[in-house]
Design a protein with these regions (language model features):
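Helical hairpin unit composed of two closely spaced alpha helices linked by a short loop
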Residues: 158-160
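Active-site proximal loop and beta-alpha junction motif in alpha/beta enzyme cores
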Residues: 1-8, 13-154, 164-219
Length: 219
């Protein structure tokens, strides 16, 4: 991200779940976020499962500037030269606002060019994350994400959550779960009948260090 605080971050929650499991020896832990408490579980294969809670699905929860709109299909359209226009995305809030388009080929669209325009769409007063999703023949979902305030990212856990919710609401997949393939790798996502969204994926160490907050703050 760009260093700004966010209400929720699925990837960070998964990483913290891994760190807590390693530090405490407990496979189940609770992480408190601005968006609420999230349960994290380390599975037998080492992957981390996170219960991301229930999505916000009405216009006021997204939030949208017009709270009378149906979030299943928003009146948004963007022409893209040489490609089918992007139309009627689904809006979901997973602790942060999302806009999800389902397209024939997510790879074909210049997301780095169209992302900023859609991020700042007037229907989203708090700006939005933008996702392009393709339902593949094998049932997996290819997902590319332009993250609010950050640009194109390798992976966005809350965008994967929003996408599984949108796919189920639009009846584009069979069953509750699907593998969502982001630039950085796959996540197993499920939108359960009880309304909660479950995310399962890897979390690995990149480095370890100690942060001197006094030095950082110039004290």
């Amino acid at each position: 991200g760009n260093g700004e605080p966010v209400e929720a971050c699925g990837n960070a929650t998964r990483c913290i779940g891994r760190l807590l499991a390693d530090e405490t020896g407990k496979t189940e832990n609770i992480v408190e976020t601005v968006a609420g408490q999230l349960g994290c579980t380390q599975l037998d294969d080492g992957t981390i499962g996170v219960n991301m809670g229930e999505p916000g699905l009405n216009a006021a929860q997204i939030p949208l500037s017009d709270d009378t709109l149906d979030t299943l299909s928003l009146p948004i359209s963007l022409d893209v030269p040489g490609l089918a226009p992007l139309t009627n995305p689904t809006a979901v809030n997973m602790g942060n606002p999302h806009m999800v388009f389902f397209v024939e080929d997510a790879e074909a669209y210049p997301l780095e060019e169209i992302g900023p325009t859609l991020e700042h769409h007037p229907l989203y007063p708090e700006r939005t994350n933008v996702s392009l999703a393709t339902i593949r023949a094998d049932g997996t979902i290819r997902l590319r994400v332009f993250e609010r305030g950050a640009g194109i990212t390798q992976a966005c856990g809350t965008a994967a959550c929003a996408t599984i919710v949108a796919a189920r609401r639009r009846q584009l997949i069979e069953g509750q779960a699907a593998m969502i393939i982001l630039d950085g790798g796959p996540l197993i996502m499920a939108y359960q009948t009880d309304g909660d969204v479950l995310m399962t994926g890897p979390a690995s160490y990149a480095f370890e260090g100690v942060l001197d907050l006094d030095a950082l703050m110039g004290r």
